[in-house]
Each structure stands twice: as C-alpha cells, then as structure tokens.
C-alpha cells in the first residue's frame, strides 16, 4: 500500500508538471506566431488567453489534490477493514499509519506562478517586450523545475522515514536515543533545505519586482501569499480548504500522541509557516517579512530593558559609586559584565547597599510610626469626650460624666490595642485616680501587665512580633514577665543567662542597644525573684521558672477603707486599688479617699492639689539607685517614698484632668522585679 501511494503521488506530480508545461508551451507558440507575422501582441486577446491558461492550470492542480485525498481516504478505510478482520496489526501501528501517509502540501503542489490578474496588469501596462516575456516564461519554468525537485526530495525523505519506522515496529524495539537524535537531525536538515528553497524563490520574485517586471499595488498582498488561482469555483475552494485542514488536524493529533517529530509539521501552506521552522530559524519566513521586523523587535525589547533596568538610566550606570557613561543599553551590559563582575569589590559594595537599605527601612518604620501617632492624636481631638484609642495599651482614658458618677463609682476605661502607635515611657505601680471635675478624668498611665493583673502570654508577643523585631520601641512588659516568657518558649523550659540575652535581642529591636543597662536589670531580676530557680547541670547553670511562686506574686492584696474595696469590686477588671504606702501617706496628711459621695464636693480640686504637693515633696528624698524593673522607664527608686509624676493639663480647661503615675517599690504585690518583705499596712485610714 505504501508503494502504491508513492507511485500515485509521483503520477500526480507528473500530471501537474505536464499540465503546467503544456500551458506554457501554448503561450510560447502563440507568441512565436505573433512574432513571425511581425505584429504587436494584442492586449485584450493576450490577457484572455493567459487567464484561460492559468485557470486551467489551477483547476488541474485542485482536482489532482482532491483525487489524491479521496484515494488516501479509501486506502485508509480498506486498511481499517483489513485490520478489523485479521486483527493481526497492533493498535499502535494503526495510530501511526495516518501520520506516515502525509499528503503533499498545497504550497508544494501549486507552482509559484504569476496569477492571471498580475499577468493582465503586465500586458495592460505594455512595459514588456516579447523578449522580456520569453525571459519571464523561462524563469517560471525554472521555478516549476525547482518545485518538482523539491517534491521528489520530500517524497524520498518521507519514504525513508516510513521504512525506518516500519523496521523499528517489526523489530519490536523502541528506538534508542542515538537513533532518535539521528532522525531528528535528518528532519531538521530537511526542513532547513525546504526553507532555503522557499527563500530562493522569494528572492527570485523580489528581483523580478525590483527590475520592474512585476508591479504590486499597495493594497494587494505579496506573491507568495496568493493561494490557488482565483479562477476556481468558490464551492471547490471551500471543499479543498476543508480537506486540507482536516488532514492537518489529523496529522497534528497523531504527532502529539506519539510525541515524535514528524514531517507533517512542514506540510503547511506558504502563508502559514510551521512552528518547527520558526524554532529552527526564527529569522526566516515564507513571506520574507519576519526577517525584516525581528531587528526592530529586538531593538524595542532592548529599549524596554533599558527603561526598566534599575542600574541604568539616562545613559549612566547607576551602580553605587560608578556613574560611568554608556551610549546605549548594549554598551551598558558590556560595562556591567566587565567592571561589576563577581569579585571582592562588588561583594563589598553589595553589602554596603544592604546596610543602606536596612537603615532606610528602619527610618521608614519610624516615620510610619510618627505618622500613625499624628493621625491618632488628631482622631483623639476630634472625638472627645468619647473614649479614644491610645498608644499600645499603655494609656487608658477614663471619662466620667455627671450621670455616670451618680450611677457608678468610676467608669470603665477603653484601651484598644494599636500596635503601630508610639510608645511612651511609663513607671510601674498602681495609678491614683484623682478627679478635679465631675465630667472627666485624664489619661492614666499604667503598665499593661499590672493593669490587667495577668502574666504575659505568648499571644501578646506573637500579635506584635514583627513590630517589636523591626521598631526600636520599648516593650510594655516587665523584665520578670519577659524572662519567664523566654524560658517557657524554650523546648526544655530552661535557659542559660546567655540564651536569655539572645532571646531578648532576637525578639525586640529595642534591646539591641544599651546592652549594659538592660542586661544588668535581667541579672538583678533573676537573682532577686524567688520564681526564678537556678539549676546546675552538665551545661552549667540554667534558669527555670517556678510557676506556683510566680502566680503567688500576681494577686493583689486589697486593704484599707471599705469604700475603697467597694470601688475596686465594682471596677476590678480595669482599675487597681490604691497602694498601701499611698494610703499611709494620705492618712498622715489627713487626706480623705475619694469615693462617689465625695465627687460632688466643690473643694475636690483643692484636696487633689494638696495631695499632689505632699506626694511630690516626698520625692526629693528618694534614692535613684536600684535595679530597673521595666525596659520602658528609668531605674526604680529603692527608698520607701512614692514618686508621683504629673501629666500635662490642657491649657483651655480651668479644671482639667489630673493623672498621676505612682511607683511603689515596697510592695511585692505590685513590684514583680524585687523581693521585699511586706510592710505593715495602716488600717486607720478614714
């Protein structure tokens, strides 16, 4: 069957050749007769004859192609019937058989001749002499001979591939990689020869056009883009197009299933170059236009790269410290590869640039933090007297109205978390709420862990982990809570002193500076707190946490006036009781406690001023030496008196809010950084 199909295709090619040569022979005879009579060729008669001849040639080519397609379909049907009856052939061979019998493409079957319309234009323009017409016919014959040689070469190559595939199938062995590579190289060489032949034809037609033998209108496509002659019936064209497209789809499906490079990919028309040919030679095309446009596309791509490259701008190299002038992007690439190669100097410059970027990122984080604080501040001013968000759980604003003061002793502060807000320095200890008006109470600073009376949890740090790692802000936790958290996060629930230091510096950017200050505080807290237990093991001395002892220190003792206890019970979630030392100081100075009954007293502001002066007077005799129990404040006061800090008041309010920050160092219930004995609490407070 394969040999029969090969002989049929050869006979078809010879028929096409005879038809085309016969048409050209008739044209030559007519021209010789005209020349022998000594007459000039008539434009009308010559155009009609040429049109008729070209239509005859095109019809012959189309009919031959249709007949070939029908014969191949019949052969395939017969083969399928034989395979169903005998059942001897494998399904793989059945799948490969349609792919092997590939029809010759339309571009191969149709000679690249001049269309009737173009020949008519040549005759109407009367620019060709009989000698020029004879030369043109000779050139057309040479083109047809080239086409025939190309077809024969194509058929030979296809027969060789069929024989190789049949031998491999009969042997029952898969082709090895060297054989596959050899077949692939042969196919590539064949495709390159096809492209070279098409390029030669294209160049020949272009030379004819340049010599003035052919004229193409601006709206008319180029010569190779002309499919069949335009004298065919539209129904025949549609049928021919359907046959060709169906054969191409079948060939592509077969080639995809077998994942083998088949010659069917080359069987496309001259107007649509194959993908493999484009991959082999991207600068070659059947219409000769791709090679003209590819340099422009490359130049455009280089321009885009030059605009987008971060190291090149305005003709200057943007490498740090270089600023070399480069004429174009190509010279810049050469300069980049030669001057800035991978060496010690480039590596050092890259490290410097990394440090610059890190500093800029830190500065950006600070600027963002400042912007957030400004926005928060403006938001606070615009929403007064409502409860407003304050920076990072450190400040709580308490608002008391007249109705609220009558209904409850104190209103509940509102402290939403704003992790991007700035951190303000605070001091440890309970806050004393002193009201100078019936309408509001100023912001009260207190420590997060003291305010909520719960130990630090991993969720508190994990929630703002990235913020603490990048921003140099003071974490709102005591050193004892941070040390406990570091030990609990370790796998063995024990850490050496150096490992505790490393945890501090790894989790908080604030501790990467001033190491001497906070490391001393960590050592003092480890030695003074009973909840931290030192254990000797193989590594050396490690520190563990006694949770029971740590939890014993957390609950706060409530003592003093029953009215104070009542107030604390009503607002125990957010408010803390007065310090015992503060109560004793108030009792000595005969300052009554502020309850709901005394809030309406008109002399409340005077009493608050007296208490503030008395407490601030005791501050002058304190000793500033001692260990710092919080990363966010100055060292603790080791003496008994209490330090009260006055918050700035609003200038436009006569009776503005008063907020006091107290630091009580004698009570272990509030001081989680020192271990002192409980002092006797004065119970005679009125």
Curated annotation (Swiss-Prot):
The gene is FOXP1. Residues 413-427 have a biased composition (Low complexity). Residues 295-306 have a biased composition (Basic and acidic residues). InterPro entries: FH_FOXP1_P2, Fork_head_dom, FOXP, FOXP-CC, TF_fork_head_CS_2, WH-like_DNA-bd_sf, WH_DNA-bd_sf. One of its GO terms (cellular component) is nucleus. This is Forkhead box protein P1. Gene3D superfamilies: 1.20.5.340, Winged helix-like DNA-binding domain superfamily/Winged helix DNA-binding domain. Residues 391-395 are annotated as: CTBP1-binding. Residues 474-564 bind DNA. The keyword DNA-binding applies. Residues 1-19, 279-292, 403-412, 428-439, 621-632 have a biased composition (Polar residues). The leucine-zipper is required for dimerization and transcriptional repression.
